[in-house]
Amino acid sequence: YVNTYGRIFYSSDLGGVTFINSASGFEVRFRGTELVAEVQTLSGGTKYPNGMFSVFVDGETDSNARILKTEASGGLRDKITIVSGLNEGEHTVKVLKRTPSNRDRLIVSEISTDGELLTAPAKPSVDIEFYGDSITCGEGVLREYKDENGNIVDSALYTQETQNVFQSYAGECAKNLGAAFRVFGRGGIALKYRKAGDPYTVSNNYESVAVDLPNSDYPYDYNSYRPSVVVVYLGTNDYLLYSKHGSTVVDDDGNRYSSGGLTVAVVNFVKDVIGQKYGYDMPVILCSNLMVPNAGLDKVMTNAAAQLTEFECVRAVGFKKGVTADKGGHPVVEDSIVAGKRLSDEIKSVLGL
């Protein structure tokens, strides 16, 4: 009766299914006027005190029309109303997480309605898997970035209220295609390089349900899901960590950051993860350039794509730089719309849509 989206896990100790990653969530079809759930919310502290979800009713696509904000529950279960006051009849409701895996998580124990649950609807035929960081997760995408005269100043206001994965380039791309999508990653995560004290990168923890959970305790089953296409937009934090911390930033083997080393890391990740888990017929798109446009990451991705000759289709997409990129800022909605259109056009070409 329930469709789920994204990497999730069930825990009998927690008494429910945990939704932790950006764009993860559930979808139900029911006959009735309201939908309620029994949940627990774990939050990321005072700056991120709530769970934040977009609710889509009967095919709605506006991720800001219905925002569900759940309160941190301190280990207790709360009964929340997801939607109410609907016209009597059949409805489809999708509840998807706006925020990344290091901010909050929702544990759902029960879903009910004042009518009856029906068989879940068919999922979209196109499904995109994204490996990314804050750019993909839409951190700060809704923040103010212009002064009263229209000059770009960038407020750099990164809170749960200014995050929305559905208005990142990934979300805009999926909306253009009518596709489902999932995200593995979160703000600040790197592909390969890390500073002392940071245990995880995407490369060393991709077999976990979420990038900050140990894969020994939270293993992910790659056989449970097969996307239509895989998008990798990583490397920004590898470069930024190196820029800030210099030679203390190394990979798991102690090698210092270099653009050549990052190229090798991209090639190895695509081969060892996407190729081995899904096969070399899986289309792969490597993205760059919304942030730090002078870092040479577009060249890294282009060079990596050229080396991945085992695959039937690997393309590199360098986006137009974001409007706040020269001030070190994250992409905003206008950037996401342009980049999302660029990527969705590329996916249409790749998949023959």
Regions found by a protein language model. Give the residues of each.
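N-terminal secretory targeting modules
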Residues: Y1-Y131, I135-V165, L353
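Conserved SGNH/GDSL esterase-like catalytic core that processes O-acyl groups on lipids
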Residues: N21-A23, I152-N255, V292-D298, H330
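Surface-exposed acidic, glycine-flexible loop patches that form ligand/cofactor-binding
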Residues: L118-P121, P214-R226, I274-Y278, S349-L353
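Structural recognition of the beta-strand scaffold that forms the well-ordered cores
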Residues: D127-Y131, T136, F181-G185, S228-Y233, ...
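Solvent-exposed, polar/charged alpha-helical surfaces in well-ordered, non-transmembrane soluble domains
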Residues: Q167, G171, K175, Y220, ...
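A structural motif corresponding to the C-terminal end of an alpha-helix
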Residues: Y169-A180, F269-P283, A304-F311
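Active-site segments of SGNH/GDSL-like serine hydrolases
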Residues: Y233-D238, V266-T302
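Catalytic His-Asp segment of secreted/periplasmic serine-dependent ester chemistry enzymes
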Residues: N289-L353
